[in-house]
């Protein structure tokens, strides 16, 4: 548990440093990192259930994507689905922590949520390609 807290603090410090630099792709992921950070203990297998903060964060991301993706009532075609997907992918790749595929796949079910975007270890964010969002281009 203590090592987990140290890793989370280190990740937040790195994120703050990276986010403060101009034109850094991570600045476009800040909201995703903050929303998904409370889920780390669950997806790493430390906790059996996601915390309420984790579920609130995933719900927030789901709402961001839901109201900006093609087919939604408030369609803006802004590329938010791809941005959120890429940010989660970056966080998973950068963390080098042992994410449990089953925990990631069960996150929506455990939070009683139907996601508007995929969360899995095999995410393919290219299926949400949107060239209209300059933030997405900076992440690629």
Swiss-Prot record:
One of its GO terms (biological process) is pollen sperm cell differentiation. Disulfide bonds join 29-87, 39-54, 55-111, 85-125. PANTHER family: NON-SPECIFIC LIPID-TRANSFER PROTEIN 2-RELATED. Residues 1-20 form the signal peptide. This is Protein ARABIDOPSIS THALIANA ANTHER 7. The keyword Nuclease does not apply. It comes from Arabidopsis thaliana. GO terms for cellular component: endoplasmic reticulum lumen. GO terms for molecular function: lipid binding; lipid transporter activity. Belongs to the plant LTP family. Keywords: Disulfide bond, Endoplasmic reticulum, Signal. Tapetum-specific. Also present in pollen. InterPro entries: Bifun_inhib/LTP/seed_sf, Bifunc_inhib/LTP/seed_store, Plant_nsLTP. CDD domains: nsLTP1 (cd01960). It is found in: Endoplasmic reticulum lumen.
């Amino acid at each position: 548990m203590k090592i987990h807290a140290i890793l989370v603090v280190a990740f937040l410090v790195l994120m703050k440093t990276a986010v403060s630099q101009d034109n850094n792709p991570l600045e476009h992921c800040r909201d995703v990192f903050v929303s998904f950070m409370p889920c780390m203990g669950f997806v790493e297998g430390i906790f059996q259930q996601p915390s309420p903060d984790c579920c609130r964060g995933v719900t927030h991301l789901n709402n961001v994507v839901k109201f900006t993706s093609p087919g939604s009532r408030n369609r803006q075609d802004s590329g938010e689905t791809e941005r959120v997907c890429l940010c989660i992918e970056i966080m998973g790749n950068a963390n080098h922590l042992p994410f449990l595929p089953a925990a990631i796949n069960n996150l929506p079910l455990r939070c009683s949520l139907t996601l508007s975007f995929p969360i899995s270890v095999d995410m393919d964010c290219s299926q949400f390609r949107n060239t209209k969002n300059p933030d997405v281009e900076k992440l690629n």
